[in-house]
């Protein structure tokens, strides 16, 4: 997290760093954390999704990709819950005016859960229950901006194979293509400040663009 020690005079604001699976979000977050002490960086709670396991030792993340219609609602609830817990903790302990989060509850709601419902992998009842939960507890976080790493689904697929994260080996290309379209639709409709990064940008170039983007919120 950020290197400063004194708490800001007001509640920090949140900037969501988004992109397809395998876009390079985790790598960029790690580099940003080291290079930008004026920012706090909160990485995605993937560890929680991997440690939640059934009797056979299969993680919730693996189960979701193995049988998406069966586990979509369960996983999306888990994703928004674990992210909400981590984000609220970061806000309470925040020592910088801006917190960069690897994805956000908005991503959970407007990209992943919305896509699951539209594709029929969450029922109408499950969707309505999800929205009640989300609207009651998650929608009022101080998210002020979105950053998107624009990466082709094909490149994302290659990077997923390279990193070899357990549970992701079965992700099909059409799923990544659908996620890309869902992200594009969300960014087109949002009223929040946005920044798009190219997959061709170096890590240093991306960090500089993010630091400049975040200055408007200080």
Regions found by a protein language model. Name each.
Residues 2-4, 157-218:
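NTP-dependent small-molecule kinase module
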Residues 17:
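Hydrophobic anchor at the beta1->P-loop junction of P-loop NTPases
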Residues 20:
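P-loop (Walker A) phosphate-binding loop of NTP-binding proteins
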Residues 25:
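Conserved lysine of the Walker
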Residues 28:
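Hydrophobic positions on the alpha1 helix immediately C-terminal to the Walker A/P-loop
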Residues 34-76, 111:
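Conserved substrate/cofactor phosphate-moiety recognition/catalytic segment
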Residues 56-98, 117-121:
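Conserved nucleotide-sensing/catalytic segment adjacent to the nucleotide-binding pocket
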Residues 109-181:
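A glycine- and Lys/Arg-enriched "phosphate-lid" helix/loop adjacent to the NTP-binding pocket
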